[in-house]
A protein has these predicted regions:
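Short, structural beta-strand-to-alpha-helix junction motif
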Residues: 23, 29, 116, 141-142, ...
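Phosphate/pyrophosphate- and phosphate-bearing ligand-binding catalytic cores of soluble enzymes
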Residues: 20, 26, 71, 170-304, ...
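Glycine-rich beta-strand-to-loop/alpha-helix junction loops that act as flexible
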Residues: 65-70, 113, 287-288
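Solvent-exposed alpha-helices and their adjacent loops that cap or buttress functional pockets
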Residues: 30-33, 57, 64-65, 72-74, ...
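FAD-binding glycine-rich core of flavoenzymes that anchor FAD
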Residues: 45-50, 54-61, 87-146, 155
Length: 325
């Protein structure tokens, strides 16, 4: 990043709102090491749009960070890091649809991309709106949540993208704001078109149902912080059913945990990263872990599983690649 680019950021966003050499540990769930070369907190979707547009239009290398709960950043000292804390949630409209001769009161909820998934779930529950209760146990924000189509499979209704009606994005190539429909995202479990396009989500509109809810509060996060160590959520996605049958996994489970256990029964550790001995599809990170340690562990497990079981595991963690393009 050049001095001229820094001046452009300061004049556009406010010299009092940009920070230099800001430690990432204060802004990421995993307390990552390293410092952002230039740091800006986008408190509203308008802030986010302004920051992203100025970066794109001036070829400033940047990345957008939510809660950092399942994202790993590396080599950020020369990048412009935008911390997205926009969190407006509002009812955007009501309508009634007829399904199987029954009326369903539907509601449209507009949400800023920096809103916490758990906060969105609680808002809906408080308002008597059902459909997103499964988000209670999922960390992170709406932006990365849609980028990765998070949820609790195998039920498709427990995937965030299923409920999306439309969204506001910024085109990564042109810097222009666009309104897109659900079809634009090409959702699959754990996937969306945003992973390819790297477009930036500003806000989303979800179509939900206003009905009484069952008790949703029993769901809890798979993420824990204990004794100075941090446990990630699931690292790899479920394997295919055909592979579970071929390998005769116990109860035909699709979780790769038992397969990883076979190659890591004696413990797998790379510096500050080790495989959990209670859930083998999870990593335990100590305070001195490095992002590259996580990447190396993922590559090691993929290689060993492919060699032993002829399966190509798919990563669920988001190893964010920063780029000005």
């Amino acid at each position: 990043m050049t001095e001229e680019q820094i001046k452009i950021l300061a004049s556009t966003l406010g010299v009092d709102r940009i920070m230099f050499d800001e430690p990432l540990k204060d802004h990421t769930y995993f307390k990552q090491k390293g410092k952002a070369g230039v740091y800006f907190e986008a408190k509203t979707s308008t802030d986010l749009e302004a920051a992203v547009r100025v970066a794109i239009l001036n070829n400033i290398p940047f990345g957008v960070l939510g809660l950092g709960s399942n994202t790993f950043l590396s080599s950020v000292d020369k990048f412009f890091i935008i911390k997205n804390t926009s969190h407006s949630i509002s009812v955007n409209g009501f309508r009634t649809s007829i399904t199987s001769r029954q009326s369903r009161p539907e509601v449209l909820i507009k949400v800023d991309s920096g809103s916490a998934l758990s906060m969105l779930a609680r808002y809906c529950i408080h308002e008597g709106i059902s459909g997103l209760e499964f988000l209670l146990g999922i960390p992170g924000t709406v932006g990365p949540g849609l980028r990765n189509n998070v949820g609790v499979p195998p039920t498709i209704k427990n995937l965030l993208g299923y409920h999306l009606q439309m969204a506001e994005i910024i085109d990564r190539k042109t810097g222009q704001k666009k309104l897109v429909s659900q079809a634009f995202f090409e959702f699959e479990y754990g996937k969306s078109f945003l992973q390819k396009s790297n477009d930036i989500l500003l806000a989303a509109v979800f179509k939900l149902v206003k009905t009484p809810n069952e008790d949703p509060w029993e769901k809890t996060s798979d993420f824990e912080i204990k004794g100075g160590e941090i446990a990630t959520g699931p690292v790899f996605k479920n394997i295919e059913y055909t592979d579970a049958v071929r390998l005769a996994t116990r109860h035909l489970t699709l979780s790769p945990s038992s397969l990883i256990q076979e190659i890591a029964s004696d413990g797998l550790k790379i510096n500050g990263v080790k495989v959990s001995n209670t859930n083998y599809n999870s990593f335990i990170l100590n305070s001195d872990f490095e992002v590259e340690d996580v990447a190396r562990m993922i590559r090691l497990i993929k290689r060993e599983i492919r060699s032993k079981f002829k399966i190509n595991l798919v990563t669920q963690l988001d190893m964010m690649k920063l780029s000005s393009k």
